[in-house]
């Protein structure tokens, strides 16, 4: 009775998440219970997020990428994710090639948050992605994609950009929607 914090997910947040994700009320309630157990204060810090993310990629170094993912979803810049931000992150990073996922991908690559992506930002994110690829898979990559620099160069060439050019959000989304090879370059799908 003296506990002022409710352990139940508010109806308002539940309805918002049901409307904006593919998750059912039961799934959201179950995930909320787990989130509350892991994060009793209702927030997850970047280091905790990195640890959890690392569990999905045990044979690689996903911490750098996890940091960028965390930054892209910490919409209020408070250094934590609440349950709503966490579920949106799960939804967008696990769904297919949707417009929303591509908006998120652009925000991931837009490291300095200036509304444009530079080649150095592309290289920074691709380097973080590359560290998630286990060594045995890296050895099987095509010659023109077997290093972060080569992948960044290939991506930049798809967009027909010079070294100092920038990519705007609409151009990024259109390019990825029209070319599956670009999608493959900007993410890592672990082999089953």
UniProtKB/Swiss-Prot annotation:
Additional facts recorded = Probably binds two or three calcium ions.
Would you identify the family this protein belongs to, as annotated? Answer: Belongs to the recoverin family.
**Sequence positions that bind Ca(2+) 2:** 110, 112, 114, 116, 121
What is the recorded name of this protein?
A: Visinin
For binding Ca(2+) 1, which residues are annotated in this chain's numbering?
74, 76, 78, 80, 85
On whether Lipoprotein is a keyword of this UniProt record, the answer is yes
Which Gene Ontology molecular-function terms are recorded?
calcium ion binding
**Lipid-linked residues (N-myristoyl glycine):** 2
Tissue specificity is: Retinal cell specific protein.
Keywords, ordered alphabetically: Calcium, Lipoprotein, Metal-binding, Myristate, Repeat, Sensory transduction, Vision
Top-level taxon of origin: Eukaryota
Q: Which GO terms describe its biological process?
A: regulation of signal transduction; visual perception
